[in-house]
């Protein structure tokens, strides 16, 4: 049985080489877990890049029934506490979907400790505004290209549709968290909007999938570009909401180019 309280740091997955230039923290999405980045972790280890990852309350091996813990603001507080406790600096936050929203909100709180943001299909005010026709087309046109939109990146490859149906029927915690996310993503909600406004000139890489129907690609680019002129956008063709999972090498290469670009600009 899940406990009412949880400790997201009880099972941290970390790689800490002796010499490190950056401290990466991976922030997973709704209903996912840090293992969604497992292919990327292998590439980081080969490069000897330091990173940390953990599961938010209600996810993976960190189950919780506490309504107070299943909120976006609580997740933000947890990440901020982790950075402060570990005395981390030069932090690069890598956030997917909900984790992307958490990343921008953490940056707004601990701006001096955050070196850069890597946002993967980040939740924003264009999220959850999905065309019903596009969903149906994706469900009933079973081509490899659009099928990926509805494949969850867990090991058993469950359909994301079945995942949501099962979660909503059996698990009150996901209902609570999903409602909180939708509320935070609505137009007119100052909390998440303030986070995106706080990006300003912070080096930021946004990676999107061309077939994403959860975080609409074109609308997200237009929305995010209004908040910062320095954001670098990369769109990976043929993938949906999890470009880091379906194209890990390309995703990793984009991060490398992004960091090299930051260094060049600093050396000027």
From Swiss-Prot:
Its domain of life reads Bacteria
Please give the family membership noted in the entry. Answer: Belongs to the lipase/esterase LIP3/BchO family.
The protein's matches in Pfam families, at most eight in alphabetical order, are given as: Hydrolase_4 (PF12146)
Q: Which UniProt keywords apply?
A: Hydrolase, Serine esterase
Q: What is this protein called?
A: Putative esterase/lipase 2
Offer a single GO CC term for the protein.
membrane
Q: Which residues does the Swiss-Prot or TrEMBL record annotate as the active site?
A: 28, 96 (charge relay system)
The GO terms this record gives for MF are: carboxylic ester hydrolase activity
Which Enzyme Commission numbers does its entry carry? 3.1.-.-
Q: Which SUPFAM superfamilies match?
A: alpha/beta-Hydrolases
């Amino acid at each position: 049985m899940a406990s009412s309280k949880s400790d997201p740091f009880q099972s941290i997955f970390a790689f800490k080489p002796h010499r490190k230039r950056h401290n990466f923290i991976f922030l997973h999405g709704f209903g996912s877990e840090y293992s969604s980045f497992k292919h990327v972790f292998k590439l980081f280890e080969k490069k000897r890049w330091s990173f940390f990852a953990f599961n938010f309350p209600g996810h993976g091996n960190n189950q919780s029934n506490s309504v107070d813990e299943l909120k976006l603001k609580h997740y933000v507080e947890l990440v901020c506490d982790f950075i402060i406790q570990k005395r981390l600096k030069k932090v690069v936050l890598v956030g997917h979907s909900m984790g992307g929203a958490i990343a921008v909100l953490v940056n707004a709180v601990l701006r001096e400790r955050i070196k850069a943001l890597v946002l993967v299909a980040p939740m924003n005010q264009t999220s959850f505004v999905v065309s019903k026709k596009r969903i149906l087309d994706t469900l009933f046109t079973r081509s490899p290209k659009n099928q990926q939109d509805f494949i969850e990146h867990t090991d058993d490859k469950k359909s994301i549709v079945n995942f949501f149906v099962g979660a909503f029927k059996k698990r009150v915690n996901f209902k609570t968290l999903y409602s909180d996310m939708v509320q935070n993503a609505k137009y007119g909600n100052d909390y998440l909007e303030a986070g995106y406004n706080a990006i300003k000139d912070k080096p930021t890489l946004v990676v999107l999938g061309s077939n994403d129907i959860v975080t609409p690609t074109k609308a997200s680019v237009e929305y995010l570009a209004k908040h910062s002129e320095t954001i670098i956008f990369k769109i990976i063709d043929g993938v949906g909401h999890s470009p880091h999972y379906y194209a890990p090498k390309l995703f990793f290469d984009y991060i490398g180019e992004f960091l090299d670009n930051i260094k060049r600009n600093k050396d000027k």
